Regions:
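Short linker/helix segments within small regulatory modules
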Residues: 48-61, 82
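Short Cys/His-centered divalent metal-binding micro-motifs
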Residues: 62-82
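A boundary/linker detector
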Residues: 1-25, 30-32, 37-43, 59, ...
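Compositionally biased, intrinsically disordered low-complexity regions
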Residues: 39, 50-53, 77
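Histidine-centered catalytic micro-motifs
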Residues: 42-50, 65-71
């Protein structure tokens, strides 16, 4: 398993391996919920392909409050439409911002 900062940018749903990064998830939780703007109770919501008990890569996380995290898992397409979100684009934006932060550190 590789650390998130070492990953080259890729389209969100084509990540070849599962990446785990607690610092990245902690950073994601520092943002407001993308759906409602809440600042508290933010979770790093995994997006992208997953099945059974396996989560998608941490690099595919977005910040959502508990309520909207649960709603997203009930139907991603409907969720994106309802809140006018482009989840793959949000993931790419967050990944790019994280890489820039890591370069500056």
């Amino acid at each position: 398993m590789r650390e998130l900062s070492a990953v080259a940018p890729r389209p969100i749903y084509q990540t070849p391996e599962i990446l785990r990064s607690e610092p990245y998830k902690r950073w994601i939780r520092s943002f407001r919920c993308l759906a409602c703007g809440k600042r508290w109770g933010i979770e790093a919501a995994h997006t992208g392909p997953h099945g059974g008990s396996q989560k998608s890569s941490d690099s595919a996380c977005i910040p959502l409050c508990q309520e909207h995290h649960r709603e997203m898992h009930r139907g991603v397409l409907r969720f994106q439409e309802r809140y006018r979100l482009d989840i793959p684009r949000e993931v790419e934006r967050l990944n790019a911002e994280w890489r820039e932060r890591r370069k500056a550190a």
